Amino acid sequence: MSRHVTVVLLLAVVLLLSSHMSHGQHWSYGLWPGGKREVEGLQESYSEVPNEVSFTDPQHFERSIPQNRISLVREALMNWLEGENTRKKI
């Protein structure tokens, strides 16, 4: 039993250390400490985004799944009974 406890404790320590080490800041082009970006880079990226958004008409989808749960159970029961009847005929 003590062997299992030591293995679990060892795994817990490894998990804690690996999660702590993975939260380091990843440096990228144009990033300063704290995740701040240069102002010029932000202005360029915002100028690329169009100011107007075109809205389309909402699409209507037909539902192929019955909403009533009783009908689902009834259909499953009928399929099961049909399967039983075909087995008896064979």
Swiss-Prot record:
<keyword id="KW-0165">Cleavage on pair of basic residues</keyword>
<comment type="function">
    <text>Stimulates the secretion of gonadotropins.</text>
</comment>
<dbReference type="InterPro" id="IPR019792">
    <property type="entry name" value="Gonadoliberin"/>
</dbReference>
<keyword id="KW-0873">Pyrrolidone carboxylic acid</keyword>
<dbReference type="InterPro" id="IPR002012">
    <property type="entry name" value="GnRH"/>
</dbReference>
<feature type="signal peptide">
    <location>
        <begin position="1"/>
        <end position="24"/>
    </location>
</feature>
<keyword id="KW-0027">Amidation</keyword>
<protein>
    <recommendedName>
        <fullName>Trp-8 progonadoliberin</fullName>
    </recommendedName>
</protein>
<feature type="modified residue" description="Pyrrolidone carboxylic acid">
    <location>
        <position position="25"/>
    </location>
</feature>
<feature type="modified residue" description="Glycine amide">
    <location>
        <position position="34"/>
    </location>
</feature>
<comment type="similarity">
    <text>Belongs to the GnRH family.</text>
</comment>
<dbReference type="GO" id="GO:0005183">
    <property type="term" value="F:gonadotropin hormone-releasing hormone activity"/>
</dbReference>
<keyword id="KW-0964">Secreted</keyword>
<keyword id="KW-0732">Signal</keyword>
<dbReference type="InterPro" id="IPR004079">
    <property type="entry name" value="Gonadoliberin_I_precursor"/>
</dbReference>
<dbReference type="GO" id="GO:0005615">
    <property type="term" value="C:extracellular space"/>
</dbReference>
<keyword id="KW-0372">Hormone</keyword>
